[in-house]
Structures are given as structure tokens and as C-alpha cells.
């Protein structure tokens, strides 16, 4: 689920000020938004726009291309959902908006947010927004498109498929959003993204949103964006407010015992544990389950249905621990997660930011704990340098950071 209630805004000074025309708008009521869109915003639980929403929504509604970057858990999905919905004409049941996400789970969550915020624009109909992801029948996609889908949210592979089959008509598209744009423009997705662009109207508005925006990705955007408005945070700001970061020096063979000790030391509402391989995820989940912890695990080799079931169990609290690979490092929001454990440090620096954003979202207090072997020391230093942050050794009284 997305945000319920107040978002703690980022420090205003964390945004670059060299982009002309970017003025923070502190209230949704002061933005040029349709009355029924405002009804949806407030009924969804938004109270005050976050920093990225204050800066990105109005430029989005003007129709120009936009590149927006902000930390995980600060309302990026809300920002582009509101901007997108304001740009659509609900009098016409044709496809007008396309949102591309790197994973099925993120696509489904995004579609839920758009559906709820756009409820009153669509006069109560939930069918205006549909998902197009792998693991579902193509015939079901045809049915959705024929029933008047106005916003499509999908993964690149499936969107390419239904577009090439002629099922997804793109001539009326007004807006394309690339969510988690750094991942979407990586080598794994780049070819599919370029395939999709071949089918899009020349004058389509393109919006990129992500927590990280490396220089090579910004360079790529020059190929398909026209004079975009840029809202970029300063590199030294790319750490998470409300997330206290620690490390534990531990060798590989002692990691499991250290993990067990942690769970015996403090009472944890819900936690996410990241490991780098599917095999280790399965092994960790098995070890924790045998110690009477309620544990779920998720990785890319599970079917779509299995992954949805796991996330449902974790969201409703039936499971208190989720062990996973980087599959869910982006975009999954579970309200009661207050601790993230990197059993293995991530293999790429950008994923560190996405991982630790699972705890303490939307201003809630959270803790990130990194298990660091002797071989990992240099990696940890690189992470600290990249984000201009300091990761402290876990203190004896660390339970205080969880509100105990």
C-alpha cells in the first residue's frame, strides 16, 4: 500500500536549485488540479505534499518532459500518479497513459495507487487502470484493453508483446512514465524500452522517476527526451532520513548465529532480510523457520502467483520476516517494517539505497543493519563515500533505536 497520512518532507536544501521555474507548492489545494482529483488525493490518505510532490507535480501537469529524483519512501509514486491523472481526459475511453515498472510487484502496487487516487475522476470505475505483466494470459490483456483502459501499468516485456500484437493501440497516448528509471534504462531493459518508443506518438510527454539517477542514465535520456525539467537531489543527500544505519563485523560462518542473536535481543515488528542468491534466501528462511520465526521468502525463480501470495502474507502480518533477493528492493511498501538487514551487502551501490528504504518509510523510524565480513570492508567504504554518509558499528543499546 502507499502512504497513509503525513509524509515527512525532505530537507528543501537537498534539491538542486539550478533548474529555473521549480518552486515548491506546499499544498495540494494550491496546485492546478481537478476537484475530483483532489478528492481522490485526500481520500487516499495524503495530507500534505512531500518535497518531491511539491516540486514535480506542477511541472508534470504542464505537459513537458520531466526527470525527477528523490529518496525511497518520499512519495515518488504519488507524484507521478497525480501528475499523470491530471493530464488525462476521462471523457474518452482510449489509452492515454502508460507507466513502465521493472517488476510485476511494483507495477501492481502502482496500479493500485493510480486507481485509488483516480477513483472520482473515473466516477467510481476501477477498470480505467489495468496492469500488463508476465505470468498472466494474453487473452486477459486483450479483454482489459477492449473494456476501455485509460492507464496501462506494466513491465516492458509484456507491454512490448501486446503492442507488437496490435492489441495495445498507442496513437492516443499522451504520457509515458518510467518508474525506477535507472533500472529501466539499464542494459537488461534498454532494448525493450527502445522497442516501445518505436510505437509511441512523437509528441508524447516522457517522465522519469527514480531514487537514483546515475550520470550514464542521464546521458541516455538525451536520446528520447526534449529539454526536460530536472528535479535532482544532491549526491550528498542520497541517504535516508529516519533510517539509522549500522554495521556488524562478522565472518560468513558466524552470520546466522549473529542473526539469531539479534532476533532474541529485540522485539521487531516486521523485518526484511536481503541476501544475494536464491540458494541463500531459501537456506536462511529454512533456518529461521526451524527456530520458530514466522518467515516468508521470495526470489525471481518463484511464479507470479507464489510471489503475490508471499507479499500478501507479509503485508497482513501473518509473516513477520521476509527473506529476499534484490527482487523487492524497489517499491514495495509494508507499513510495519522497522528493520532491514543486509545479510549480504548489495553487489551494486544503487541497490543499497533501495534496500534500506524498506524500513522507516514516510517518516517512520527505522534501522538498517549491515553484516560486514573482512572482504566487505572496502564495499562498505565505497557505499559510505558514494552517499556521503557514515555507517556506525552497532551499539550495545541499539534496541533504543526501535523505540524500546
UniProtKB/Swiss-Prot annotation:
Task: List the record's Gene Ontology CC terms alphabetically.
Answer: cytoplasm; cytoplasmic stress granule; cytosol; eukaryotic translation initiation factor 4F complex
Keywords from the named record: ATP-binding, Helicase, Hydrolase, Initiation factor, Nucleotide-binding, Protein biosynthesis, RNA-binding
**GO biological-process terms attached to the record:** cytoplasmic translational initiation
Residue intervals passing through the bilayer: none
Q: Does the record's keyword annotation contain Repeat?
A: no
Entry keyword Nucleotide-binding: yes
What Enzyme Commission number(s) appear in the record?
3.6.4.13
Lineage: superkingdom:
Eukaryota
The record, for Gene3D superfamilies, names: P-loop containing nucleotide triphosphate hydrolases
Group of enzyme by EC: hydrolase
Indicate which residues the UniProt annotation says bind ATP: 70-77
Q: Where is this motif: Q motif?
A: 26-54
Q: Which Pfam families match?
A: DEAD, Helicase_C
Motif DEAD box per UniProt: ranges: 179-182
Q: Where is the Helicase ATP-binding domain?
A: 57-231
The record's family statement is: Belongs to the DEAD box helicase family. eIF4A subfamily.
Q: What is the name attached to this protein's record? A: Probable eukaryotic initiation factor 4A
Amino acid at each position: 500500500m502507499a502512504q497513509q497520512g503525513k509524509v515527512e518532507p525532505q530537507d528543501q536544501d537537498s534539491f538542486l536549485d539550478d533548474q529555473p521555474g521549480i518552486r515548491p507548492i506546499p499544498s495540494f489545494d494550491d496546485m492546478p488540479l481537478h476537484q475530483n482529483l483532489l478528492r481522490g488525493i485526500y481520500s487516499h490518505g495524503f495530507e500534505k505534499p512531500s518535497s518531491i510532490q511539491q516540486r514535480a507535480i506542477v511541472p508534470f501537469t504542464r505537459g513537458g518532459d520531466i526527470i525527477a529524483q528523490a529518496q525511497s519512501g518520499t512519495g515518488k509514486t504519488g507524484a507521478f500518479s497525480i501528475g499523470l491523472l491530471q493530464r488525462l481526459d476521462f471523457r474518452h475511453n482510449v489509452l492515454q497513459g502508460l507507466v513502465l515498472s521493472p517488476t510485476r510487484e511494483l507495477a501492481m502496487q502502482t496500479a493500485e495507487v493510480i486507481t485509488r487516487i483516480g477513483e472520482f475522476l473515473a466516477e467510481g470505475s476501477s477498470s480505467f487502470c489495468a496492469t500488463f505483466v508476465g505470468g498472466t494470459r494474453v487473452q486477459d490483456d486483450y479483454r482489459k484493453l477492449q473494456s476501455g483502459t485509460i492507464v496501462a501499468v506494466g513491465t516492458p516485456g509484456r507491454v512490448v508483446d501486446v503492442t507488437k500484437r496490435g492489441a495495445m493501440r498507442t496513437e492516443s497516448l499522451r504520457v509515458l512514465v518510467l518508474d525506477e528509471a535507472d533500472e529501466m534504462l539499464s542494459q537488461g531493459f534498454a532494448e525493450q524500452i527502445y522497442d516501445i518508443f518505436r510505437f509511441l506518438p512523437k509528441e508524447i510527454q516522457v517522465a522519469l522517476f527514480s531514487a537514483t539517477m546515475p550520470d550514464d542514465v542521464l546521458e541516455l535520456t538525451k536520446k528520447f527526451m526534449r529539454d526536460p525539467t530536472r528535479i535532482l537531489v544532491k549526491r550528498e543527500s542520497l541517504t535516508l532520513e529516519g533510517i539509522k544505519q549500522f554495521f556488524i563485523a562478522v565472518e560468513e560462518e558466524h552470520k546466522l548465529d549473529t542473526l539469531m542473536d539479534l532476533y532474541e535481543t529485540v522485539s521487531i515488528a516486521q523485518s526484511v532480510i536481503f541476501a544475494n542468491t536464491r540458494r541463500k534466501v531459501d537456506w536462511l528462511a529454512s533456518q529461521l523457520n526451524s527456530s520458530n520465526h514466522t518467515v516468508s521468502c521470495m526470489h525471481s525463480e518463484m511464479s507470479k502467483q507464489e510471489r503475490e501470495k508471499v507479499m500478501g502474507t507479509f503485508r497482513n502480518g501473518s509473516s513477520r520476516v521476509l527473506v529476499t533477493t534484490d527482487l523487492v528492493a524497489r517499491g514495495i511498501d509494508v507499513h510495519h517494517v522497522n528493520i532491514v538487514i543486509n545479510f549480504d551487502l548489495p553487489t551494486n551501490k544503487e541497490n543499497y539505497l533501495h534496500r534500506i528504504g524498506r524500513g522507516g518509510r514516510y517518516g517512520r523510524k527505522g534501522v538498517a543493519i549491515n553484516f560486514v565480513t573482512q572482504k566487505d570492508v572496502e564495499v562498505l567504504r565505497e557505499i559510505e563515500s558514494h552517499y556521503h554518509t557514515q555507517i556506525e558499528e552497532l551499539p550495545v543499546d541499539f534496541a533504543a533505536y526501535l523505540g524500546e
